[in-house]
Amino acid sequence: MANPRNEAALAELKARFAETDTVVLTEYRGLTVAQTTELRKALGFDVQYSVAKNTLVKIAANEAGVEGLDDLLTGPTAVAFIKGEAVDTAKVLKKFGEENKAFVVKGGYMDGNALTAEQVNAIAELDNRETTLAKLAGAMKGSLAKAAGLFNAPASQVARLAVALQDKKDA
């Protein structure tokens, strides 16, 4: 019969995989409890960061349809289940890894695809959703202003021509 603690942990992992689209696997070997607590605080409420047995993570991931993580599940592994903005979380993980050399991002899973550590770090270089939308709005505003100017140009040219003709008649 299976260990009840493992069964409970497996059920919790399955639920987490089911409710998130993005997962990042990390190696925490060499981190102190204080450093891990600091990381959890930095990640915020949209991320559940927990240590789990590799075997249980493999089973839960496979049952949730998450493929491609098996090779990453070696050694001590902690899993970040991301409910919010993946870019912001990737930035926090990358910064934490730069400050704590013992911390390593192994890879992850996002939108149906397994990710390498390099891809997770590349995501950290992207702008978050809010910044991207602001840039898009700014670009659209500039383009709309140019378009309005182009549409108004022929009308203003006709008006100037009419004024010039009127001035010529009056002279």
Swiss-Prot record:
Name the NCBIfam families on file. Answer: PRK00099.1-1
Instruction: Quote the function comment for this protein.
Output: Forms part of the ribosomal stalk, playing a central role in the interaction of the ribosome with GTP-bound translation factors.
Quaternary arrangement and interactors, per the entry?
Answer: Part of the ribosomal stalk of the 50S ribosomal subunit. The N-terminus interacts with L11 and the large rRNA to form the base of the stalk. The C-terminus forms an elongated spine to which L12 dimers bind in a sequential fashion forming a multimeric L10(L12)X complex.
GO cellular component annotations of the record: ribonucleoprotein complex; ribosome
State the name under which the record lists this protein. Answer: Large ribosomal subunit protein uL10
Q: Note the Gene3D superfamilies from the entry.
A: 3.30.70.1730
Q: What biological-process terms (Gene Ontology) are attached?
A: translation
UniProt keywords (A-Z) are: Ribonucleoprotein, Ribosomal protein, RNA-binding, rRNA-binding
Say which family it is in.
Answer: Belongs to the universal ribosomal protein uL10 family.
HAMAP family linked to this entry: Ribosomal_uL10
Print the organism lineage: Bacteria, Bacillati, Actinomycetota, Actinomycetes, Mycobacteriales
GO MF, one annotated term: large ribosomal subunit rRNA binding
